[in-house]
Regions:
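Active-site-adjacent segment of SDR/Rossmann-fold oxidoreductases
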Residues: 36, 52, 57-67, 117-121
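A short helix-coil junction within the Rossmann-fold of NAD(P)-dependent oxidoreductases
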Residues: 7-22, 117
C-alpha cells in the first residue's frame, strides 16, 4: 500500500507544483481483522490496522494537493476465503439464486463510488462493506479521561481507572472470541 501510493503521490505532487489540476484518490484495502482484531492472526491484524492508520495519515497529509485517501474493509468471497473450508461454506454463492451476500461486486460498487467525483470531499474514512451494508468505522479516538493535576502515584491509579472504565462503552469484541 505505502510503496504503490508513494509513487502515485510523487506524480500528483509534481503536477500540483507545476500548477496543474489534481483530483486524485487513494483507496486502500484493510480488513475487519485490523479493525477489531482476529484470534490467531495477530500478524495479519496488525498489518491491516497499519493500513487503516496509513490511510488516516495520507488523508491529513495529502488533502492540500486535492488527493483523498480512504480505506475499505471488504467482506467478500475471495481466493483466500475460499481456501478455508469453514469460510468457503459460509460465504458460498446461494444455489437458489437469492441475493449473493458475499459477491465481490457488492464491495466493488463502493470502491467505484469512492473513486468518483461525487466522493471528492470524502477523505480520511475507513469503511466496512459486506453484502448490501456499508458502515463507517470510527476507530481509535480519545474519549473520557481523568487528570490528577500531577504525577500519578501507583496506588491512586486503580481507583481512578475503575471509575473511568465504569463510564466507558465496553471494548470491541475481537473476532473469534
Amino acid at each position: 500500500h505505502f510503496c504503490i501510493s508513494s509513487h502515485a503521490v510523487h506524480y500528483w505532487r509534481g503536477r500540483s507544483k507545476e500548477g496543474k489540476p489534481v483530483d486524485a484518490r487513494i483507496i486502500n484495502t484493510t480488513s475487519g481483522a485490523g479493525l477489531q482484531g482476529s484470534i490467531g492472526q495477530s500478524n495479519y491484524a496488525a498489518a491491516k490496522a497499519g493500513i487503516a492508520a496509513l490511510t488516516l495519515n495520507q488523508a491529513a497529509e495529502l488533502g492540500r494537493y486535492n488527493i483523498t485517501a480512504n480505506a475499505v474493509a471488504p467482506s467478500a468471497r475471495t481466493g483466500m476465503t475460499s481456501a478455508v473450508p469453514e469460510m468457503a461454506e459460509r460465504m458460498a454463492k446461494p444455489e437458489d439464486g437469492s441475493f449473493d451476500h458475499f459477491a465481490p461486486e457488492n464491495v466493488s460498487n463502493l470502491l467505484a463510488w469512492l473513486a468518483s467525483a461525487e466522493a471528492e470531499s470524502v477523505t480520511g474514512r475507513v469503511f466496512e462493506a459486506e453484502g448490501g451494508r456499508i458502515c463507517i468505522c470510527d476507530g481509535w479516538r480519545t474519549t473520557a479521561g481523568v487528570d490528577s493535576g500531577a504525577a500519578w502515584a501507583p496506588a491512586e491509579i486503580g481507583a481512578a481507572m475503575k471509575a473511568l472504565l465504569a463510564e466507558e462503552v465496553p471494548a470491541q469484541q475481537v473476532w473469534g472470541t
